[in-house]
């Protein structure tokens, strides 16, 4: 019947889409991760004076914690682990603080690298972290 044919076409379409996405997973992961990190670094660069003041050591302690919460949210959107070698909560917290340290270093050293380059560095850091956390899967 027609409903069965339509269902079969839909199932085949889903299978093709799933295969296409699985073939492009690494490329998509790289692209989305670099874009997300570049967006963050571009925003910071556009607001250089503001962030320089925040990271000068005399700013409110609550800013780093709030900023870390924001970074965790961005990272969780980009990364889904398969099998955790360490508990996910510990891993994502450590990665977010490490990434915040990268931003701090970039800002306090005069933002010499372009935001796009920092986005690449962010991708490299995250991709290596994902390899480690999913080792053995």
Where on the chain are the PLM-derived regions?
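Hydrophobic core segments within long, regular secondary-structure runs in both alpha-
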Residues: 41, 68, 72, 119-127
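Hydrophobic/aromatic residues within well-ordered alpha-helical segments
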Residues: 9-13, 33-36, 63, 67, ...
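Hydrophobic alpha-helical connector segments
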Residues: 18-49
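Hydrophobic alpha-helical segments that form the core
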Residues: 86-109, 113-129
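A short secondary-structure junction motif
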Residues: 9-20, 47, 70-78, 129, ...
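HTH DNA-binding helix-turn interface
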Residues: 1-7, 11
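Short, hydrophobic secondary-structure boundary micro-motifs
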Residues: 52-54, 115
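Amphipathic alpha-helical packing segments from all-alpha helical-bundle domains
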Residues: 58-82, 86-97, 131
């Amino acid at each position: 019947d027609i409903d069965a044919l339509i269902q079969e076409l839909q199932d085949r379409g889903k299978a093709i889409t799933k295969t296409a996405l699985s073939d492009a997973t690494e490329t998509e992961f790289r692209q989305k991760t670099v874009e997300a990190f570049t967006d963050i670094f571009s925003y910071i660069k556009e607001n250089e004076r503001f962030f320089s003041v925040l990271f000068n050591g005399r700013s409110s302690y609550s800013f780093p914690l709030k900023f870390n919460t924001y970074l965790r949210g961005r990272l969780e959107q980009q990364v889904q682990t398969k099998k955790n070698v360490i508990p996910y909560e510990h891993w994502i917290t450590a990665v977010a603080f490490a990434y915040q340290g990268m931003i701090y270093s970039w800002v306090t050293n005069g933002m010499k690298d372009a935001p796009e380059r920092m986005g690449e560095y962010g991708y490299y850091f995250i991709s290596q972290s994902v390899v480690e956390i999913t080792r053995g899967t």
